[in-house]
Amino acid sequence: MVIITSWKRFKEYLYYDQELELLLDISRMNFSAEFLTELAEPMRDAYHQLQLLEKGALANPDEGRMVGHYWLRNPDLAPTEEIAQDIKETLKEILDFAEQIHSGRLQGEKGNPFRNILLVGVGGSILGPRFVADALASSRDKMKAFFIDNGDPDGIDRVLSRIGEELPATLCLIISKSGGTIETRNGMLEVRRAYEEAGLSFPDHAVAITQRGSQLDKLSQKEGWLRAFPMWDWVGGRTSLLSAVGLLSLALQGIDVAGLLQGAKDCDGRTRRPDTLANPGALLALMWYYSTQGQGGKQMVVLPYKDRLELFTKYLQQLIMESLGKEKNLQGETVHQGITVYGNKGSSDQHSYLQQLLEGPDNFFVTFIEVLKDRQGSSAYMEENSTSGEYLQAFLLGTREALTQKGRESLTITVKEVNAYTIGVLIALFERAVSIYALLVGINAYHQPAVEMGKKAAGQAIQLKNNIVECLKKHPDKRFSVHEIALAIGEEAHQEMVFKLLLHLTTNPEHGVNMAAGHPLPESRFFVSGPIL
């Protein structure tokens, strides 16, 4: 592929907004003017559907829900006064609570001022807050944030070890919309045990962020937790960053949540425009559509040339892949939509997978993210009368040019600096692009049925494990093969899973399962020792 580049084409397709401090350059995507003309009618329909969505239409038909993350930064757009007031009151409560913590009016049980925040959640309830907490962290932060976002026991131990003796001064936020998410429940129970082993009352350090009336909400009220903040059924986890899910921890950290909300609100205003060339969200979605030909399957490599945006790729990975990775369209037809997102940061990635991008399969497009401001204050010159920041930009421009020469497509998003406002802009920009792309290809971007399949299968694996342990304990000292165990518990069709579960059981001490290693390994025998008489 020969990519057409010229100063004229660059100027023709450059989106620039001085107030947003945002530039979007799509000129190195090899689309034609006819492409935009051909998509004009589908885009008009998409704009109409977006209007209906923001007015409260059931944009998530499979779950019968409205989609209202746009209302979080502009409550006056909410379809009812009740929703608008709930959003406004929740934000006020968040800011009031943060002020009480910062002032010391609200302290831990032993009079310890809170200095740390520990967030426990999974998926969208953690990825967004963690990204922004890292992107906007500074030496002026009022509290230090820690995160437990996985069910890995060793990972939990590592986080708690880093907190160490600061646990009495650590406020714990438990985030779960339903209150029944297994990973979050397990994380909460692990953390609760840590507080109790330290002689501390967990409820005196705990805050719930959950849907009203959920299991978690009821638990927090029963035990008298410090506070509970709401999640709403019209906000999905991956778009919940600007609700209490993200705003509470960020306000506690000392981050400018007003700036974050304003940036998102202002960007939303631009991405509502029905003029496609004046709408950065529409342009971004159209480039995805062009690259995938509306069929999905293409890879998006995200390269932010800024350490503060390193976690942005992980955030986008969930936002885009969980939203757009769908087997069926809205008509029930099999389409297997999706865009694979990966990346880390420039210029590190130039020394990892750039080789393949330049000479391997042409099955991707690159999204460069450029930040113009290098640092607070001035920089020293390295060599060639150039600062390290100037070298970093040169690496971005050089990589982009090399890709173009090899016929590999890219687009570039530029912001002036990383601050709360521009982070809000970026979040809103990609949220809108996801919505528009989903409308163009006719899929539901707001559910995740396959994730539920995985949860169901995990529950079945736990039940299978329990059946294995029960079988072995009924026959102490008797050595069973995998086949014999599977036969005994009626799971002959799942011998591989039985074997995998047994390997884990024998590596950990809790159930007392032992292995007499066989050759080959799957021929091993398993047993539980009986009592020593």
Swiss-Prot record:
GO BP terms in the entry: gluconeogenesis; glucose 6-phosphate metabolic process; glycolytic process
CDD domains for the chain: SIS_PGI_1, SIS_PGI_2
Compartments where located: Cytoplasm
EC number: 5.3.1.9
SUPFAM superfamilies in alphabetical order: SIS domain
Cited Pfam families: PGI
NCBIfam families recorded: PRK14096.1
Protein name (Swiss-Prot/TrEMBL): Glucose-6-phosphate isomerase
Gene behind the chain: pgi
